[in-house]
């Protein structure tokens, strides 16, 4: 093989690798993922489709802000989002949306979220009901979740 053929082959190989890397990155971007499973719970991976679903079902929304590198997020997901009692309540009462604050920085900043984990509850008309900044053990999260449910009942009367 001549030196020119070697250079051309190397350039073609590099081009293929660059295109493959771009395609792989785009296939894993939140814009191409409709759902993400955290713990034992499935969430919409974007605000817009989750909000549309909440409007269609006339349900309140639970938005969970996280990042893949956040230790306290992983701990919350392993404990609270894997607990059957908690996940049953969340799935029955809310449309669930998860926002990766690194990949979806604007969504987080627009809602004044600057740390993870962070949770916001909205009623079915889109009014903010409660915020939970930071990690909560599952028992404390369950107490807070029940408080939110009570506030939702009162606001519907």
Functional labels for PLM-detected ranges:
Residues 1-39:
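N-terminal targeting signals for export/organelle localization
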Residues 41-44, 86-105:
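Thiol-based oxidoreductase modules, predominantly thioredoxin-like and allied folds used
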Residues 67-68, 101-102, 124-125, 137:
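Solvent-exposed coil/turn segments that connect beta secondary-structure elements
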């Amino acid at each position: 093989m001549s030196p020119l053929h070697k250079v051309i082959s190397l350039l073609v190989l590099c081009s293929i690798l660059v295109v493959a890397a771009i395609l792989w990155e785009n296939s894993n971007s939140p814009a191409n993922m409709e759902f993400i499973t955290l713990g034992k719970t499935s969430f919409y991976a974007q605000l817009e489709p989750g909000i549309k679903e909440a409007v269609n079902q006339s349900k309140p929304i639970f938005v969970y802000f996280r990042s893949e590198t956040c230790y306290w997020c992983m701990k919350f997901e392993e404990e609270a989002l894997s607990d059957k009692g908690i996940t049953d309540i969340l799935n029955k009462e809310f449309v669930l949306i998860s926002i990766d604050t690194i990949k979806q920085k604007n969504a987080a900043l627009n809602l004044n979220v600057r740390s993870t984990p962070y949770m916001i509850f909205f009623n079915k008309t889109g009014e903010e009901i409660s915020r939970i900044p930071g990690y909560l053990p599952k028992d404390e999260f369950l107490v807070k979740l029940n408080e939110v449910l009570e506030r939702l009942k009162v606001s519907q009367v």
